């Protein structure tokens, strides 16, 4: 499958002054017509649609009256159990192809755990730290771009110096990463390994092995391996999941990876189960702090999810429903981008096989203008630059499209409007 749509050999940039002027007049007229429709459409976040949330309606009645015992006899109604119940941990271990001992099950948000492990490293240091990160003169963090804005918000909150590296089709630019980690101030990096937000790119095993084996100057260096879209295919095929913790152990770096995933875009976005996969030493460090923060996760909800899925194949069955719901929306976005923009050579976009986003690169210098025009037309887009640390896209060209929430009919109107805004911003750029 194509990863990036091919740009036209003819570009708006090649139009002479008269032709670009006429084109600008025409597209401005279309934009004014768009504004007159008083639209109110939202493409900002990768939220599941109501149809997708309905797939998990059965959860609202689970585990059911009298069903409160986990497989090991744990009464899920009571306190305790920092690791989570084995029922749901085993399902996720089977789904990801890892030992169940590697998996901790938590509450709804894996992002909460990411914040915890970074904040605890900052306050206390992690189990490989010489001192807390807050005592370091500078903490630097590697950020593959374009990437996930909420990741960058966490490292921004702690004042880390964020260093951008390209997110390529096979994963982060490893030549750049391997050079950066020679600096002991570089303490970690973000990675979304499967159907990455927003490009849809997937880390290859070769890149994963390089991440596992590379020498780092900081002994407490950590990779936050956020496998948010591990099973979120748009086709009938599921991606191969890399046992990244196992790779780290095999390479002699068992504590390098903090790996995460969750059911947030599988069942109910605000009421699911998160999973933390890491080494035995890291788990001991984590539960040592987590046991002070709280007494344990929502085990009733974990049991409900275990009953709902049944086994790993049950998870895949649910994901096939999601794929059937999402694929027509992604296809509609790609169809409109191709029909409206391809002939003018003003944009390039990813063609993902899974995940929740399409990454759109417009004429450099115009992304913020496209977002501004879209807002004027009643179409909300994620802010230009949001896929970069500190919201600063050096080329001002990237926009993230989130097709999941609106019905196809609304999505078609919104994307036709976005295409008009891309063309108008490009025409303004080349006319000046």
From Swiss-Prot:
InterPro entries: AspAT_Ic, PyrdxlP-dep_Trfase, PyrdxlP-dep_Trfase_major, PyrdxlP-dep_Trfase_small
Essential cofactor(s): pyridoxal 5'-phosphate
Cysteine disulfide partners in this protein: none
Consequence recorded when altering residue 265 to A: Loss of activity
Top-level lineage group: Bacteria
Effect of residue 109 to A: 30% decrease in activity
Family membership: Belongs to the class-I pyridoxal-phosphate-dependent aminotransferase family.
Matching Pfam families: Asp_aminotransf
Residue numbers binding pyridoxal 5'-phosphate: 109-111, 197, 229, 262-265
Effect ascribed to mutating residue 110 to A: 30% decrease in activity
Naturally occurring in which organism (per UniProt): Corynebacterium glutamicum (strain ATCC 13032 / DSM 20300 / JCM 1318 / BCRC 11384 / CCUG 27702 / LMG 3730 / NBRC 12168 / NCIMB 10025 / NRRL B-2784 / 534)
EC number from the UniProt entry: 2.6.1.1
Protein name from the UniProt record: Aspartate aminotransferase
Effect ascribed to mutating residue 400 to A: Loss of activity
Transferase keyword on record: yes
GO MF term set: L-aspartate:2-oxoglutarate aminotransferase activity
Alphabetical keyword list: Aminotransferase, Pyridoxal phosphate, Transferase
Subunit structure: Homodimer.
Mutagenesis or variant effect for residue 226 to A: Loss of activity
Outcome of mutating residue 79 to A: Loss of activity
């Amino acid at each position: 499958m194509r990863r990036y749509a091919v740009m036209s050999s003819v570009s708006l940039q090649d139009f002479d002054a008269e032709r670009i002027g006429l084109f600008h007049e025409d597209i401005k007229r279309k934009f004014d017509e768009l504004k007159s429709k008083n639209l109110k459409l939202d493409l900002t976040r990768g939220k599941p649609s109501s149809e997708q949330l309905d797939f998990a309606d059965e959860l609202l009645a689970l585990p059911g009256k009298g069903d409160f015992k986990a497989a090991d006899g744990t009464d899920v109604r009571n306190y305790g159990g920092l690791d989570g119940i084995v029922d749901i941990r085993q399902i996720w271990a089977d789904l990801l192809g890892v030992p169940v001992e590697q998996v901790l099950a938590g509450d709804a948000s894996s992002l909460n755990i990411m914040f915890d492990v970074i904040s605890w490293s900052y306050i206390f240091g992690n189990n490989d730290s010489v001192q807390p990160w807050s005592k370091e003169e500078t903490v630097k963090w590697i950020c593959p771009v374009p990437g996930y804005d909420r990741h960058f918000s966490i490292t921004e909150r702690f004042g880390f110096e964020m260093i951008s590296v390209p997110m390529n089709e096979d994963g982060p630019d490893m030549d750049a990463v391997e050079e950066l980690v020679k600096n002991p101030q570089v303490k970690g990096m973000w990675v979304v390994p499967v159907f990455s937000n927003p490009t849809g790119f997937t880390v290859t095993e070769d890149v994963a092995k390089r991440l596992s084996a590379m020498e780092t100057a900081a002994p407490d260096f950590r990779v936050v391996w956020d496998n948010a879209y591990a099973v979120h295919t748009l086709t009938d095929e599921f991606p191969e999941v890399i046992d990244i913790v196992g790779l780290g152990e095999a390479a002699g770096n068992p504590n390098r990876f903090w790996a995460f995933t969750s059911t947030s875009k599988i069942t109910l976005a605000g009421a699911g189960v998160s999973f933390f996969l890491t080494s035995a030493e890291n788990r001991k460090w984590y539960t040592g702090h987590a046991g002070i923060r709280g007494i344990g996760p929502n085990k009733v909800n974990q049991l409900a999810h275990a009953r709902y899925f049944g086994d790993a194949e049950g998870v895949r069955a649910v994901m096939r429903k999601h794929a059937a719901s999402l694929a027509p929306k992604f296809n509609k976005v790609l169809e409109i981008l191709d029909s409206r923009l391809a002939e003018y050579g003003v944009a390039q976009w990813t063609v993902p096989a899974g995940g929740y986003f399409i990454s759109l690169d417009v004429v450099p210098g115009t992304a913020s203008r496209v977002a501004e025009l879209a807002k004027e037309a009643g179409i909300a887009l994620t802010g230009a630059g949001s896929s970069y640390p500190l919201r600063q896209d050096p080329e001002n060209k990237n926009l993230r499209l989130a097709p999941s929430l609106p019905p196809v009919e609304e999505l078609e109107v919104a994307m036709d409007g976005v295409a008009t805004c891309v063309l108008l911003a490009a025409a303004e750029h080349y006319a000046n």
